[in-house]
């Protein structure tokens, strides 16, 4: 079966995992830094932040 | 010089020559208080004196027509109020005749809606699978967003902004390959890599059932039709499960030779659209009466896409109209009359079409795309003019889900972010009342016969 829609792309998690093995950082601690569905704030979004509904 | 003057003399009876001679004389005898006949427009004077009043009585109905009439009057130089002219202005006349009409835009009847170009929220989505064939995002009618991140399903309450974990699937069964809310937004179907489907009650947060035996490989597509859960698998099969029955498999649709990656019931629940990795779209007929033959032939088969079809969207304001989007090797959005099977339109978007959503209030279609721009594009239907392009994702935008009120769209991509876009604007008041009424319905948890 041909996987015609496959695009191999390095995700940020994969990049961090790669970096952590190089730097010897514990992967568990690295995973805990990211909050699932946590708010990611950046400058352009702060002004536009508003409550849904 | 001598020849010219003699020529003019010879044709003294010609009115044009008389006109020139009189003009020359008038220049010599210029007077501020005597009207200059050569400078007057007698045709306009006649019109103004006879029909001008009639136009004043007429009432222009709409603003656009008024703008059109104004522009037309300016182009034809009909805005003058004076009839008598005391000076000959040849340059003004020439420039007036040859000048282009003004390029100002006519007053639009409907002002264009402001569409924010930035997402209003960005949420972290670590571990979301960058797999074109899965369906990992759904926004239920109880205003809870479900998203599958690897082995775990998270629920995000859009009303309160709180997040909680529903379930983490065992490694032998997982990861999660698809999720889909029931119409009442209270139960969630979870398709797994091991070919099983779990049903979860999200009010009490407990599993109520596991469906087995329908597929031989992962279940990447799910679609609810009241109490029927339709599943699409990597094996190309489409299975209708009646979740009220112990032996749940009531129908199997065979037609796709490769993975089923798009699955959508029409709003009436009578037609099912399926898209596959075989570049084919099928339309299936759902009949409530159980037949002796559990395997059914399709109503229509569309083979015009040249890549996998994952994006499917039934039009909410025109029954039987289906929009489909093709993958990398196609990049087109096509519109189908699913009653006749005719392809009504085909639009080249320039990149992989991953997902499609219709607006619930306007005649607009939102598409999400892959390489190179990874953008969301808002189209005006049926002209298919681009109204907006929403950027921010740095990877292909595989998944889109629409809020129950129809205003907000959530998009998730392989860049592991979930973005919320206020793209469809504020709903009309009637729609909002209807939407709020639906949630406060005391018997919302009971299945309605539609």
Curated annotation (Swiss-Prot), chain B:
Pathway: Protein modification; protein ubiquitination. One of its GO terms (molecular function) is kinase binding. CDD domains: WD40. GO terms for cellular component: Cul4-RING E3 ubiquitin ligase complex; nucleus. Pfam families: WD40_CDC20-Fz. WD repeats lie at residues 129-166, 171-210, 214-251, 255-294, 304-346, 348-389, 392-431. Keywords: Cell cycle, Cell division, Mitosis, Nucleus, Repeat, Ubl conjugation pathway, WD repeat. InterPro entries: Cdc20/Fizzy (IPR033010), WD40/YVTN_repeat-like_dom_sf (IPR015943), WD40_CDC20-Fz (IPR056150), WD40_repeat_CS (IPR019775), WD40_repeat_dom_sf (IPR036322), WD40_rpt (IPR001680). It is found in: Nucleus. Belongs to the WD repeat CDC20/Fizzy family. Component of the anaphase promoting complex/cyclosome (APC/C), a cell cycle-regulated E3 ubiquitin-protein ligase complex that controls progression through mitosis and the G1 phase of the cell cycle. This is Cell division cycle 20.5, cofactor of APC complex. It comes from Arabidopsis thaliana. The lineage of its organism: Eukaryota, Viridiplantae, Streptophyta, Embryophyta, Tracheophyta.
């Amino acid at each position: 079966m041909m996987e015609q829609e496959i695009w191999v792309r390095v995700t940020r998690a994969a990049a961090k995992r790669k970096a952590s093995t190089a730097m010897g950082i514990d992967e568990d601690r690295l995973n805990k830094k990211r909050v699932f569905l946590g708010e990611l704030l950046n400058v352009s979004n702060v002004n536009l932040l508003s409550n849904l509904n | 010089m001598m020849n010219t003057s003699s020529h003019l003399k010879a044709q003294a009876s010609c009115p044009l020559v008389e006109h020139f001679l009189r003009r020359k004389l008038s220049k010599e005898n210029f007077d501020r208080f005597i009207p200059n006949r050569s400078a007057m427009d007698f045709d306009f004077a006649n019109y103004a004196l006879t029909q001008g009043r009639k136009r004043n009585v007429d009432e222009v109905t709409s603003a656009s027509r008024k703008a059109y009439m104004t522009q037309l009057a300016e182009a034809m130089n009909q805005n003058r109020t004076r009839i008598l002219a005391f000076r000959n202005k040849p340059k003004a006349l020439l420039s007036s005749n040859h000048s282009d009409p003004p390029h100002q835009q006519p007053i639009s009847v409907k002002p264009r809606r402001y569409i924010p170009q930035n997402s209003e929220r960005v949420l972290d989505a670590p571990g979301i699978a960058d797999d074109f064939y899965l369906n990992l995002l759904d926004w239920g009618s109880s205003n809870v967003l479900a998203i599958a991140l690897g082995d775990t399903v998270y629920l995000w309450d859009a009303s309160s902004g709180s997040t909680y974990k529903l379930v983490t699937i065992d490694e032998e069964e997982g990861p999660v390959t698809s999720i889909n809310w029931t119409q009442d937004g209270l139960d969630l179907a979870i398709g797994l890599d091991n070919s099983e489907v779990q049903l979860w009650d999200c009010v009490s947060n407990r599993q109520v059932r596991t469906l087995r035996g329908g597929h031989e490989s992962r279940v990447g597509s799910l679609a609810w039709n009241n109490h029927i859960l339709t599943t699409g698998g990597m094996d190309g099969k489409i299975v209708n499960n009646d979740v009220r029955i112990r032996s749940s498999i009531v129908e199997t649709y065979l037609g796709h030779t490769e993975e089923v990656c798009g699955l959508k019931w029409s709003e009436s629940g009578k037609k099912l659209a399926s898209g596959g990795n075989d570049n084919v779209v099928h339309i299936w007929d759902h009949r409530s009466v159980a037949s002796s033959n559990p395997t059914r032939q399709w109503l229509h088969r569309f083979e015009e896409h040249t890549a996998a079809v994952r994006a499917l969207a039934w039009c909410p304001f025109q029954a039987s109209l289906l929009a489909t989007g093709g993958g990398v090797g196609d990049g087109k959005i096509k519109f189908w009359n699913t009653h006749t099977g005719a392809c009504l339109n085909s639009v080249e978007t320039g990149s992989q079409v991953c997902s499609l959503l219709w607006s619930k209030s306007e005649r607009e279609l939102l598409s999400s795309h892959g390489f190179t721009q990874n953008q969301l594009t808002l189209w005006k239907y049926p002209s298919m003019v681009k109204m907006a392009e929403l950027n921010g994702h740095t990877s292909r935008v595989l998944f889109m889900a629409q809020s129950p009120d129809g205003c907000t769209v959530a998009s998730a991509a392989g860049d592991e972010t979930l973005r919320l876009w206020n793209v469809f604007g504020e709903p009309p008041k009637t729609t909002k009342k209807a939407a709020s009424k639906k949630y406060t319905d005391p018997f919302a948890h009971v299945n309605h016969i539609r």
